[in-house]
């Protein structure tokens, strides 16, 4: 039974991700050969490491400025009709803007391995000015994530127990009339939705016994727990430990994941290739990145995500590379091992987290941008647009400094009719991948830092700029660490200065 609650709270192979250098463009060739002689190139590489007390290390450990973190939610505008089988219609609400402070906790160096271990730590502070008229008190209708998640998990793992959930729902969740429930944005994201554990029914007690063991649920009082998307981990270190290369011996390997959760391979997917752990932890890039792109180990997606070079460009007077990311097509032979079974594969540019996170969640780009039109048309109210919904980032290649980044990821839930659950009994017979919310995590360097980047002959200044913005790329494609594994065990809170609204 306990395994069901991975939903609430539930890398590092010997292979290395090298940043192979292709033939540089004429422009960058001139920069590297004339403005950066060999000894300066060597110095830059050596400075872009995670050595103790270095400027890069300090910024890597705790970002000096916050990311802008925007959340857009989807309001179900026809909840009663949808509960009876009608097509679901959505209205986007947002953005709700937060300052996201990124840091690392429980840091330990291992000099013999040239490695460092740590736990990710994120703190969110509501930015009322950037949110405009939105306050968090707005009322929206969403599918009750706990009901849908529990129904899916129990049906898959312990189907003979599904009747207990149906009996417990009225007591746990206030006897909702449909699976689409009214919530405030503030409660859904941070303050928490109530879970009643007065244990007046034996089925209710079964679930409450599990909830009380689970740090993903915040105890409000003796009879009530609270559950939210971000609340329990706001300002709290992630329990899963990373071990990454410090890059002192080989600067090309800085940030390369050596172990994740004390393991050098995963045990999630059906083939060794998909279980590989390789790439960076997303929080630092080496100097002299190339058009080959680079890999990121997206821990909460249980997979490696690869960037793709798009073009060279002049970014406000700085020679730069533009990269993008998509999630590929599970139908491709190399990615087929990411499917939940050989027969059940989602369509392109989606990630099924059922096996990874123990919950029927699907990751995509916002509004199913670059995904199959079937997903876009299954619900009303979606309008995918490249300029608003793609993942894109621009990097000054010599220093590995991101000058602009837009990381946009949508989280969806698989909503299916279930004849054993009263609230799911009358849903449309066709399964739907229903958008819940999407995030836009971004940064653009201000003129202060851009002007220093333009002074390419100023090596020390250039390296320090890289240090300042290293943490601004943190999170990258590992955004799901903030929303998906609600069920992973959490540690004691730190960074008490954080708040939600």
What are the functions of these language-model segments?
Residues 2-319, 326-501:
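Extracellular or lumenal secretory-pathway regions
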């Amino acid at each position: 039974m306990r395994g069901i609650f991975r939903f609430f709270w539930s890398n590092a192979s010997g292979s290395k991700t090298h940043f192979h250098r292709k033939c540089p463009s004429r422009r960058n060739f001139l920069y590297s050969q004339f403005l950066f002689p060999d000894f300066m190139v060597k110095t830059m590489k050596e400075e872009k490491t995670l050595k103790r007390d270095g400027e890069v290390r300090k910024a890597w450990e705790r970002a000096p400025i916050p990311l802008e973190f925007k959340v857009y939610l989807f309001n179900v505008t026809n909840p009663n009709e949808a509960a009876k089988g009608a097509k679901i219609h959505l209205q986007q609400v947002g953005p709700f803007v937060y300052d996201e402070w990124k840091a690392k906790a429980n840091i330990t160096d291992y000099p013999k391995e040239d490695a460092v271990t740590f736990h990710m730590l994120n703190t969110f502070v509501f930015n009322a000015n950037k949110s405009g008229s939105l306050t968090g008190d707005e009322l929206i209708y969403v599918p009750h994530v706990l009901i849908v998640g529990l129904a899916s998990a129990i049906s898959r793992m312990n189907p003979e127990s599904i009747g207990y959930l149906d009996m417990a729902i009225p007591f746990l969740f206030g006897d909702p009339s449909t699976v689409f429930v009214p919530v405030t944005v503030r409660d859904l994201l941070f303050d928490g939705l109530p879970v009643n554990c007065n244990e007046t029914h034996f089925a209710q007690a079964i679930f409450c016994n599990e909830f009380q063991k689970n740090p993903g649920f915040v105890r409000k009082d003796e009879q009530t727990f609270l559950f939210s998307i971000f609340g329990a981990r706001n300002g709290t270190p992630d329990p899963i430990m990373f071990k990454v290369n410090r890059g002192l011996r080989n600067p090309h390997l800085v940030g390369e994941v050596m172990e994740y959760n004390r393991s050098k391979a995963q045990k999630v997917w059906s083939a060794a290739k998909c279980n590989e752990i390789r790439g960076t932890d997303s929080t630092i890039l080496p100097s002299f990145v190339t058009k080959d792109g680079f890999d990121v180990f997206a821990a909460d997606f249980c997979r490696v995500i690869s960037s793709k070079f798009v073009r060279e460009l002049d970014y406000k007077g700085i020679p730069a590379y533009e990269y993008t990311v998509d999630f590929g097509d599970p139908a491709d032979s190399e990615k087929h091992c990411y499917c939940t079974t050989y027969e059940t594969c989602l369509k392109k540019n989606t990630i099924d987290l059922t096996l990874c996170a123990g919950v029927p969640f699907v990751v995509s780009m916002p509004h199913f941008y670059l995904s199959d039109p079937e997903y876009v048309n299954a619900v009303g109210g979606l309008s995918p647009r490249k300029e608003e919904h793609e993942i894109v980032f621009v990097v000054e290649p010599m220093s590995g400094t991101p000058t602009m980044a837009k990381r946009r990821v949508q989280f969806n839930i698989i909503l299916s009719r279930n004849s054993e659950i009263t609230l799911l009994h009358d849903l449309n017979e066709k399964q739907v991948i229903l958008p819940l919310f999407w995030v836009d995590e971004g940064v653009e360097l201000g003129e202060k830092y851009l002007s220093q980047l333009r002074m390419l002959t100023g090596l020390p200044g250039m390296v320090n700029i890289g240090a300042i913005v290293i943490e601004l790329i943190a999170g990258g494609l590992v955004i799901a660490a903030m929303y998906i594994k609600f069920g992973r065990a959490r540690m004691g809170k730190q960074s008490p200065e954080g708040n939600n609204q």
